[in-house]
């Protein structure tokens, strides 16, 4: 068994903790490349109960190859944006999904309104949903659904931020906005599976 940890150090004034988030900011999705590190208990149970899932192919890969893709590293593409005044928040989408992670960086008087219909759901999640007959609410709570990181930025910075990320092959896109609220993430719309 292999176990690893990473520890980072950052100057306090450079921490991107969400405290600069403003009403009207946009929420960007940075795509994931698969399950990353979450949802494996559900997937393992699914493989035990429905072993035929192992015969599935996902975008030319076996099901096992698709679920075992290494977690994408976002550091190289993000480091050039650190220190940018218009970058107000970052949330890594892990267990708890968008709702359970984006809310952690929201100021107390604000909420994020996210249209899940805008999420570019990866095909692997469609296979998991189909075999497990998993409700969308559970899919959104368990998996990243194709969103590895959410980024909160001023709308005026959108062209510069997306152009920067595109240089690294990352096609970031808008999934929501910051509104008045109570530190919650409001999910609207309907997931669209490929």
Per-region residue spans from a language model:
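Glycine-rich anion-binding loops of enzyme active sites
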Residues: 1-41, 177, 188-190
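Secondary-structure boundary elements
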Residues: 21-22, 49, 84
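Short, compositionally biased
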Residues: 40-51
């Amino acid at each position: 068994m292999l176990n690893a940890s990473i520890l980072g150090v950052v100057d306090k004034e450079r921490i991107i903790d969400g405290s600069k988030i403003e009403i009207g900011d946009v929420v960007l999705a940075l795509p994931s490349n698969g399950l990353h590190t979450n949802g494996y208990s559900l997937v393992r149970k699914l493989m035990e109960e429905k072993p035929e899932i192992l015969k599935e192919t996902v975008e030319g890969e076996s099901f096992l190859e698709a679920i075992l893709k290494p977690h994408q590293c976002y550091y190289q593409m993000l480091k050039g944006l650190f220190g940018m005044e218009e970058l107000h928040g970052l949330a890594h989408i892990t267990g708890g999904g968008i709702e359970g992670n984006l809310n952690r960086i929201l100021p107390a008087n604000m909420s994020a309104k996210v249209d899940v219909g805008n999420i570019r759901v990866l095909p692997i999640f469609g296979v998991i949903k189909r075999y497990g007959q998993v409700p969308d609410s559970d899919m959104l709570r368990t998996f990243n659904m194709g969103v590895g990181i959410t980024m909160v930025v001023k709308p005026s910075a959108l062209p510069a931020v997306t152009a920067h990320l595109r240089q690294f092959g990352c096609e970031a896109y808008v999934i929501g906005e910051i509104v008045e609220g109570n530190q919650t993430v409001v999910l609207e719309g309907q997931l669209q599976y490929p």
